[in-house]
């Protein structure tokens, strides 16, 4: 892209306007039109980054067994269903710390329910084949009533504060600084169990959000796939991002009936589709999956399978990058799904800036920053009404 006045004329661009492309188009009569078109395509694809240095793995990050308020699956059946029926690569069992209303808490007894959860995670862990993450869901009023803790090992202790079911700002800050745990809230938009990203201190906002379970996207208020009975302003992903929070996204089904990772046809749209997380990781191990989540190299979607490869100047989703004065953002988009993709939106600072209705592979050039640090992510919509999202990339220019 060498035209000296391109940045005077436009904000967004694409490889199809490069000089080599134009020269081929204006090359006159050609003996092999098909071969010419192939060269035209090659001139655009040469701007693409190399193949990803990571592998894609899919997982279930939120579900319950009879150890708390699950109604059908014990911890063995839980992992078996996810591994053998949903055919996912990794899973976290996230039973409630209160153990289910009227039942013993997870830490009660010797051995305790938590001991069973630890041992079951170890039992089903097969490095390279199926990864189990030790986790649980913790009530944490008033900041996040439903908050899930994911650990980087199978021997971690539960985190209890001054008062069970609650958390103080001091306790939350200490938790967010730990390297061995990732904290991700659930139902942040809910009136009863939500969060207020527009009001709380910025350093209390978690590094990721659970975007969707079965229905109810937490992207923004008024999303067309939202079906819950209550919602509350301030608890959405975009509320946090617009404040400057560096927040990525994951998903989980929050199933209580053993249908984790699978379509629940009887529930109808949108609730029949489970939230599924995708990660870009070096390997399918506890260390590999945890590192990918901690780094926000994550995307998520409603049911089935979807792969989102989103990079800016070679950097992956979840990264914060700085460009030089003469550099511009080379935005790479490549999305694949198990059904036809209806629309891909490039969202910049909360607004759709480029939409693809048909193409699923595209390089976009963005010449200008709008604020000190811009955030970019993709929103994907399929023909059957499912949605997908990826963690943002944050871009600062010198």
Which sequence ranges carry the predicted segments?
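Extended, charged catalytic domains and RNA/DNA-binding interfaces, predominantly
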Residues: 1-398
């Amino acid at each position: 892209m060498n035209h000296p006045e391109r940045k005077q004329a436009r904000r967004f661009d694409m490889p199809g306007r490069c000089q080599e492309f134009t020269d081929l188009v204006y090359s006159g009569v050609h003996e092999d039109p098909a071969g010419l078109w192939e060269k035209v395509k090659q001139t655009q694809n040469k701007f693409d980054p190399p193949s990803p240095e990571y592998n894609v793995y899919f997982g279930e990050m939120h579900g319950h067994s009879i150890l708390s308020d699950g109604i059908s699956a014990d911890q063995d059946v839980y992992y078996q269903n996810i591994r053998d029926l949903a055919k996912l690569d990794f899973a976290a069992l996230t039973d409630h710390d209160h153990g289910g209303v009227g039942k013993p808490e997870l830490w009660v007894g010797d051995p305790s329910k938590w001991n069973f959860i630890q041992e079951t995670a170890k039992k089903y862990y097969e490095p390279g084949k199926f990864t189990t993450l030790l986790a649980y869901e913790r009530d944490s009023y008033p900041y996040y009533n439903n908050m899930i803790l994911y650990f980087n090992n199978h021997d971690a202790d539960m985190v209890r504060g001054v008062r069970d079911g609650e958390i103080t700002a001091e306790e939350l800050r200490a938790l967010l600084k730990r390297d061995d745990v990732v904290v991700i809230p659930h139902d942040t938009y809910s009136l009863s169990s939500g969060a207020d990203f527009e009001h709380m201190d910025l350093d209390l906002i978690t590094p990721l959000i659970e975007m969707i379970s079965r229905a109810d996207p937490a992207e923004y208020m008024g999303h067309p796939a939202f079906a819950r009975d209550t919602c509350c302003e301030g608890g959405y992903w975009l509320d946090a991002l617009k404040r400057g929070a560096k927040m990525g996204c994951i998903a989980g089904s929050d199933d209580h009936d053993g249908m984790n990772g699978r379509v629940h046809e009887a529930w109808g749209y949108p609730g029949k589709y489970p939230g599924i997380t995708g990660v870009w990781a070096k390997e399918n191990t506890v260390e590999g999956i945890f590192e990918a989540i901690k780094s926000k190299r994550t995307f998520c979607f409603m049911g089935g399978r979807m792969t989102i490869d989103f990079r800016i100047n070679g950097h992956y989703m979840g990264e914060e990058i700085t460009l030089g004065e003469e550099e511009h953002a080379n935005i790479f988009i490549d999305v694949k799904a198990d059904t036809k993709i209806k629309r891909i939106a490039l969202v910049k600072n909360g607004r759709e800036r480029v939409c693809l209705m048909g193409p699923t592979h595209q390089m976009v050039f963005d010449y200008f920053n709008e604020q000190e640090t811009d955030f970019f992510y993709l929103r994907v919509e399929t023909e059957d009404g499912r949605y997908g999202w990826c963690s943002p990339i944050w871009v600062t220019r010198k």
